[in-house]
Amino acid sequence: MSSNDSNDTDKQHTRLDPTGVDDAYIPPEQPETKHHRFKISKDTLRNHFIAAAGEFCGTFMFLWCAYVICNVANHDVALVAAPDGSHPGQLIMIAIGFGFSVMFSIWCFAGVSGGALNPAVSLSLCLARAVSPTRCVVMWVSQIVAGMAAGGAASAMTPGEVLFANSLGLGCSRTRGLFLEMFGTAILCLTVLMTAVEKRETNFMAALPIGISLFIAHVALTAYTGTGVNPARSLGAAVAARYFPHYHWIYWIGPLLGSILAWSVWQLLQILDYTTYVTAEKAASTKEKAQKKVKPAVPLLWLKSNFSLLFFISRSLALNVIIFGKN
């Protein structure tokens, strides 16, 4: 082998293996399919504290606003006509209060801790490996403490009874309430997984569909269960009202089962690798649009290339018209 060939081989080997040892070479990592929003950094004590502070502030802000709005709605005179809290005006006001409160709270604290603000959502994120189990426990503690703090603050700042605690209504049984809470939470958690965890161009807008999903859940469930879908919300309100019904467990088991159900649906989509289908559909659509744009350009190119001929013909016709017109 010549010296030049030897040098080329050494250079190629250096490019592929900077260490010069084949066994120690580590290939580049594959790109992540999950969004980095919830992975603020490694699980150090400092970073756990940052996540805990972000979840506490975000959950407190979300639930305090929602509790106060809910209290105002339930103190309305319409409560006399609809003692179960099923008056449409109350339902819409409560749903808007919770939906918009979680929306702006997520937008504020998504860059700090991810903005889960809900133990059920945190469980879905942990199952999806968007956060570690340790981080999930830290978030749970912060969210539950923030829920109790928000309930106490809302109760202390507003006069009258505490009317934002969860309870069954319209003759809803515990079993029905459990399944309603489970499916309502599943819708919320699946929205989080599909809009915030999946890597998309619209991740920065994830707070909007999450808020809308919580709004829809409240419109659907409030008359029947009071809409928990968040154990921190249910516990904080129960502590503030000093009201723990014998069926309080459905506001914990239901949301946790819902978060597992949402993760199961999301995991099934990952196994089916739905992104390849979506990518193929987008590629086909882009190709079709490109072909449609090219077709109108063909007559234009013909006119441009034959402009001189067309000009000569039109000039001849014009002269003939003028000559015959004079005759």
Curated annotation (Swiss-Prot):
Keywords: Cell membrane, Endoplasmic reticulum, Membrane, Repeat, Transmembrane, Transmembrane helix, Transport
GO-annotated molecular function: water channel activity
Transmembrane regions listed in the UniProt entry: 49-69, 92-112, 137-157, 177-197, 204-224, 249-269
Ranges for region Disordered: 1-34
InterPro entries per record: Aquaporin-like, Aquaporin_transptr, MIP, MIP_CS
Membrane side Extracellular: residue ranges: 70-91, 158-176, 225-248
UniProt key word Transport: yes
Localization per Swiss-Prot or TrEMBL: Endoplasmic reticulum membrane; Cell membrane
Topology relative to the membrane: Multi-pass membrane protein
GO cellular component: a single term: plasma membrane
Chain positions of motif NPA 1: 118-120
Keyword Cell membrane: yes
Residue spans, topological domain Cytoplasmic: 1-48, 113-136, 198-203, 270-327
Residue numbers covered by motif NPA 2: 230-232
Function: Water channel required to facilitate the transport of water across membranes. Involved in sporulation, freeze tolerance and osmotolerance. Is non-functional in most laboratory strains.
Family in the record: Belongs to the MIP/aquaporin (TC 1.A.8) family.
UniProt note: domains: Aquaporins contain two tandem repeats each containing three membrane-spanning domains and a pore-forming loop with the signature motif Asn-Pro-Ala (NPA).
NCBIfam families tied to this protein: MIP
Name this protein carries in UniProt: Aquaporin-1
Organism: Saccharomyces cerevisiae (strain Lalvin EC1118 / Prise de mousse) (Baker's yeast)
Gene that this polypeptide is encoded by: AQY1
